[in-house]
Swiss-Prot record:
The gene is rplT. Disulfide bonds: none annotated. This is Large ribosomal subunit protein bL20. GO terms for cellular component: ribonucleoprotein complex; ribosome. Binds directly to 23S ribosomal RNA and is necessary for the in vitro assembly process of the 50S ribosomal subunit. It is not involved in the protein synthesizing functions of that subunit. Keywords: Ribonucleoprotein, Ribosomal protein, RNA-binding, rRNA-binding. PANTHER family: 39S RIBOSOMAL PROTEIN L20 (PTHR10986). NCBIfam families: rplT_bact (TIGR01032). It holds the Pfam family Ribosomal_L20. It comes from Sorangium cellulosum (strain So ce56). InterPro entries: Ribosomal_bL20 (IPR005813), RIBOSOMAL_L20_CS (IPR049946), Ribosomal_protein_bL20_C (IPR035566).
């Protein structure tokens, strides 16, 4: 089998991988095989975390809305149900932002939702 001299292409490929592992610990930053393995795992974790991020934020928004709703004498589920029945289209992200930054207007929204929830 003839010898294959890859020249600069192999070096370029290795350097591309090793540049991505800059800041990693011990051999993971300067040994090619370890760097490839670590990068592959990092990409997997990144992919998984991008999916989990959406769930985590939704849970955070619901927790914030529930806390603010309880301060206004109702619960999260009653508030969301009342908003839906009243025809108020505010998503959870916006509701949580209102609850944090403008509690008075969140209270007004909760008051609008409470009669609709009672029906």
């Amino acid at each position: 089998m003839p010898r294959v001299k890859r020249g600069f292409k192999a070096r370029r490929r290795r350097n591309r991988v090793l540049n991505q592992t800059e800041g990693y610990f011990l051999g993971r930053k300067n040994r090619f095989r370890q760097a490839v393995e670590v990068l592959r795992h990092a990409w997997e974790y990144g992919y998984i975390s991008r999916k989990l991020k959406k769930r985590d934020f939704r849970r955070l928004w619901i927790t914030r809305i529930n806390a603010a709703a309880r301060l206004n004498g109702t619960t999260y589920s009653r508030l969301v149900s009342g908003l839906k029945k009243a025809g108020i289209a505010l998503d959870r992200k916006i509701l949580s932002e209102i609850a944090i930054h403008d509690p008075a207007s969140f209270g007004a929204v909760a008051k609008l939702a409470s009669p609709a929830a009672a029906k």
